[in-house]
Amino acid sequence: MKDRIYVCHTYYHAYVAFLKELALPREKRGQATLLLSSMSNHFEDFGERAFSTGLFEEVLPFDEKREDFFPELAKYRVDKGNIVFNMWQRIKFTRRYAKLEAPYVPVDFKQYGEVYVFCDSDPIGYYLNQNKIRYHALEDGLNCLVHFDAARYDNRGHFGLKAFLSSKLNLIFVQNGYGKYCLDMEVNDIGAIQMPCPKYRELPRKQLVDRLTQEDKDIILQAFVRDMDGLKEKIDQCNQVSEDGKTTPKILILTDPLCTLDVREKIFRDIVETYEKQGQIFIKPHPRDELDYSKVFPGYPMFDGTMPMEMLNFFEGLRFDIVVTVFTDLKGITFADKLVRLGDEFMDKYEDPMIHNQNKRIGILEKEDETISKQ
C-alpha cells in the first residue's frame, strides 16, 4: 500500500499539492505520487523539475481522455425530450465513459491510502466513482466555486434529483462534492460560497503559504520556475528607480484563456490601452492561454506563462502598484497595492453575457467588479 497520490490538471493544482506536502512533518515527505494529466495542460518538463526536488516519490504522466475522444459516447448526449429518458441515457454514459477511460489510467488507485483529485469534473471523477474508489476532491482554482458553481450550473433543472442519483446511488456523476465516493472537498473559503455542498471543508491557502520556510519556498521555485535568471531580470525591471529617485507605477496584467483568440487579443489590447496611461505595463500570460502575447505586445516585459502567479509572492521587495485581470481570483496575491478583477460586467462588452454569467443563471449573484486595496 502506497501513502497518497495527487491528480493534477494544471500548474496551480501542482502548486497546491506542493503546499500540502510541505505542510507535513519532514519525515512524511517524499512518499507521495504526483500524477500530471495532459488533458488540458502541457506540462513540458515540469515533471522532471518536480521530481528533482525530492518532495515526491514519483511523478507520472496521465494521458487522460476527454469524452469526444470516444465517438461512441456521442449517442448518449442526444436530447430524448424528457428527463426520464435523458437520465437513462446519462446513466449509460456514466458507466461506459468510466470503462473507456480505464486503459489510460496509469496507476492502481486502490493501492493508495489517500487519493486527492483536483477538478473531479474531469474524466477521472467518473472513473473513481464507477470503480468505487474513495477520494478527496480539491477546488479547481482559488475560490473557483465562488465565481462559478459548476455542479449546479451543469446540472440545472432538478438539481436535487441529480445530486441524489450521484451521491446516494452512484447512477450518474455530479462533480465538486456530490460523487458517492467523494469523501470531502477542500475549498479555500466556505463562507464565500453561497450554496455549499455538505462535504465541503475549509483549508485556507493562506494558512499553507504562511507556514512556508525559505527552504520550502526554494523547493517550490525549483519546480515551477524554469528560467530563474529571466525571472530575476523581470523583477529587477520592476524595481528600477529613475535617476531623479522617482519610480514609475508598475502595473501587472494577468491574462485569462477567454473567448476566441481574436476576441481575446482585443480584450487585452483594450486593457493595456486603459492602464498604460497609469504606469509601466508588465504582462503575465495564463498557463493555458495560447495567445502569443510576445507578438501582440513586443515592447512590454513578459513573465513566463507556465509559472503560477503565486511564485511572485516569494520575492521580497517585489511590488506592483496595480494587478489587473478579468476572471482570475486575486486574493492569493501579496505583491500589489491594488487588485482589480474586472469580472462579468466587463466581459459583457465582448461576448454574449449568457456565456459567462453562469452563476446568475442559477440564481447566484456576486459582486461583478472587484477592486481590493492592500495596505
Q: What residue ranges belong to the model's regions?
A:
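Active-site and donor-binding regions of nucleotide-sugar-utilizing enzymes
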Residues: 7-177, 314, 326-332
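Leloir-type glycosyltransferase catalytic cores
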Residues: 355-375
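Conserved donor-binding/catalytic core segment of Leloir-type glycosyltransferases
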Residues: 245-259
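A nucleotide-sugar donor-handling region in carbohydrate enzymes
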Residues: 139, 147, 152-249
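A donor-sugar binding/catalytic signature common to diverse glycosyltransferases
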Residues: 310-355
